[in-house]
């Protein structure tokens, strides 16, 4: 199973934008996230469509957080970037076989993965971007 990194990138970008309090370019975000600006733009397009960020062109342009980090849940972020936490591209068995186990296993596993994704997104409903900002800030002496 492979989990798409879009959710991780989106959360990281939202924390950066919230912490900075100003617009940041895709290049500045990419530098902090340790990825490339094209990937940042691709993922943040989903956040923009969901109304979490806005973009502005020009000298002071870039991405700016428009959502309230105190109420923006990780579930909302996951939904904005179409995250599936549990997925499997390969299925065992063969739907065309006479064996009920062999022909039914893909459906059984898909239902299991669907339930696991529902549990993950329900859990994320209770975690906000602001709560992660407090966790991500290191304690300094």
Label for each model-derived stretch:
Residues 38:
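Key DNA-contact positions within bacterial/archaeal DNA-binding proteins
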Residues 44-48:
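Basic amphipathic alpha-helical segments that dock to polyanions
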Residues 51-66:
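Beta-hairpin "wing" of winged helix-turn-helix
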Residues 133-139:
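Conserved small/polar residues in nucleotide/adenosyl-binding loops
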